Amino acid sequence: MASLLLFVLVIQIITYLINTIGARTIDSLLWLLYIKLPNQASQVAREQRHAKLEVIRLKREMSATSSQDEFAKWAKLRRRHDKAMEEYDVKNKKLSALKTSFDWTIKTVRWVSTTGVTVILQFWFSKSPIFDLPRGWLPWQVEWILSFPRAPLGTVSIQVWGGACGTVIALVGGAMGVAAPAFKKINQPRGEAQKMGTPRGSREQTPVRKTQ
């Protein structure tokens, strides 16, 4: 069961990283990578950016054109601007629909690969011990808790092992988050700390007594 032990540990680490970084942040990064690939979404994204730039350009030309002195030119620019705006709205709605579908797919894959796999493993291996405890090492009450709910007495169940892994990973991650700023401060170069001292040229001068 060593492979199952490590597999549960890896799932808990992945789950912790997702919760720490944030699902939305990960989804946004994956979307940016996805639209860089040669697919329909990347094509629509390029067309949407092109339409947006065209709207901005026409709007600037309209602002630089007087609606009174150059009404004919201004009206022509206005019609082109409205048409470009409509095209931009169509591309933007299409891109939003593709992103919604992409986000739903990513959420489904993320749930299946973490929570879904955990539930399936806990159900399928509920009677299988992750590892055996030394005989007589712990009281039978503690052994019963560690084997909960259906693993043999004197062993550790997959449910208990998964919960223990999640707790330890969260504690280690929290400790690293607290220790990182302190470690960075300790390793700060001394030159930067010395800059906070008395600036050059600001020494106090000893008063000189005048002789009569």
Swiss-Prot record:
Coiled coil as a keyword?
yes
Identify the residue ranges that face the Lumenal compartment according to the record: 1-4, 132-155
Residue ranges annotated as compositionally biased, kind Basic and acidic residues, are 201-212
The subcellular localization recorded is: Endoplasmic reticulum membrane
> Which protein, by its recorded name, is this?
Protein GET1
**Subunit comment:** Interacts with GET3.
User: Among its keywords, does the record have Nucleus?
Assistant: no
Look up and give the organism this protein is from.
Arthroderma otae (strain ATCC MYA-4605 / CBS 113480)
